[in-house]
Amino acid sequence: MAQHFDICIRGAGIVGRALALLLARERLRVALVAAPQTASKTQDVRAYALNGASKQLLDSLRAWPDAQHATPIQRMHVVGDGNSHVQFDAQAQGAEALTWIVDVPALEQRLADAVRYQPLIEVVDAPVAAPLTAICEGRASSTRAELGAEF
């Protein structure tokens, strides 16, 4: 018997996985199209600066990395040309942090683990039929190229 999916998400990066988890939380059946993983010869040292809303969303998905992989930024001093400058302070704004610097591999792993344990998400190799398709492939999107949609 063929599987029925409510949505097909093309792209299993951070955005695609987070969207899949959010939709599954709403009881939707999700097909998540993931490209085959290739082993990298170099260590992934990428990091994202994520705001409080992103942290709150990832916390709600139980996908926020541990403290070793998410560093809060408490203060920031920006110096411009000449004598211009501006300072920001999380405590003065009543915020936990101005932003967090998050290791990309740790965040990707937390989201992948959450997807693996979500029964309403099925990771597939190729797009499947669904009433709705979300394109979360990033800049080099093969789907947009198929559709002739420039970015």
Label every model-predicted segment.
Residues 2, 71-147:
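Conserved N-terminal helical subregion
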Residues 2-15, 31:
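Beta1/beta-strand and adjacent pyrophosphate-binding region of the FAD-binding site
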Residues 10, 22-46:
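Glycine-rich FAD pyrophosphate-binding loop
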Residues 15, 38, 140:
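Conserved Rossmann-like nucleotide-cofactor binding loop
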Residues 17-18, 53:
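Short alpha-helical segment within the catalytic ATP-binding CA
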Residues 29, 64, 122:
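Residue-level detector of anion-binding/catalytic polar loops
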Residues 43-80:
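N-terminal FAD cofactor-binding segment of flavoenzymes
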Residues 150-151:
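A short alpha->loop->secondary-structure connector
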